[in-house]
Amino acid sequence: LDRINATQVLQYNGAFQQIVGLPQFPDATTLRRFLRRLRPRHIRQLVRLHDQLRQALFARPRPRSSLVFDLDSVVLVLYGHAEGARVGYNPKKRGRRSYHPLLCFEAHRQEFWHGSLRPGNTVAATGAVPFLRVCLAKVPPGIARSRIRVRGDSGFFGKRVVEFLDEERAGYTLVAKEHKPIKALARGCRFQKLR
């Protein structure tokens, strides 16, 4: 909820206010209080609203023909006993409870696409395939799977994720840890220039 402060820029964006039908955009403190009071079913409704708004604005100012998804997982340190928080990998605050959400952003417009809140004791690839399935389900019908690229760090590199993206015919760039078999395969690859 600390990142709500980034919405302050919308207070001065008359076009956005007109699109959503607000006389003025609420203050960050008001938004934070509102979001803290939401129950899970309200959060699901808010996600659906976000997806509908994205669909309505997707082709503006011109239709897109491709998408690039950036996957990320981040450790959110918590203080207190928040529901679902667990002690897990936490390089800055060892032993603290945290969340480890999965996030997907569309790179061209730096647009939030989908997110999933997970306990802190999960690794990056945990639940990545179902997460990607939801991300791809939100792609408008006019964009071919071959025009979708997925990028992720080494936490997402694994057999299940690679096989899923191959089956979906989506392109991908996943960082792989430098193990000897991977190095040997990389040396044997031919360079192919892409358009």
Spans of features found by a protein language model:
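Gly-rich Lys/Arg/Thr-decorated short loops/hinges at beta-loop-alpha junctions or inter-strand turns
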Residues: 108-120
